[in-house]
């Protein structure tokens, strides 16, 4: 999985207010503990 905003954007992922979404269909809560969701970005 992408580990930062740049990598996430490169694979077309995004992170909303509560949910992370990646092309691999991985879903996760946006929390400081999640490597790709340390802050809110879309």
Swiss-Prot record:
Checking Pfam families in the record gives: Defensin_beta (PF00711)
Q: Which residues form the signal peptide?
A: none
Keyword flag Disulfide bond:
yes
Residue ranges crossing the lipid bilayer per the database entry: none
For this UniProt record, give its keywords in alphabetical order, as a comma-separated list. Antibiotic, Antimicrobial, Defensin, Disulfide bond, Secreted
Q: Does the keyword Disulfide bond apply?
A: yes
Subcellular localization, as worded in the UniProt entry: Secreted
Instruction: Tell me, in one coarse class, where this protein mainly resides.
Output: secreted
Which Cys pairs does UniProt list as disulfide-bonded?
Answer: 8-36, 15-30, 20-37
Mind telling me which InterPro entries this protein's record contains? Defensin_beta-like
Gene Ontology biological process terms from the UniProt entry: defense response to bacterium
Query: One GO term of the cellular component aspect?
Result: extracellular region
Q: Which family does it belong to?
A: Belongs to the beta-defensin family.
State what this protein does: Has antibacterial activity against the Gram-positive bacterium S.aureus 1056 MRSA (MIC=11.48 ug/ml) and the Gram-negative bacterium E.coli O157:H7 (MIC=12.03 ug/ml). Does not have antifungal activity against the yeast C.albicans 3153A.
Q: What is this protein called?
A: Ostricacin-4
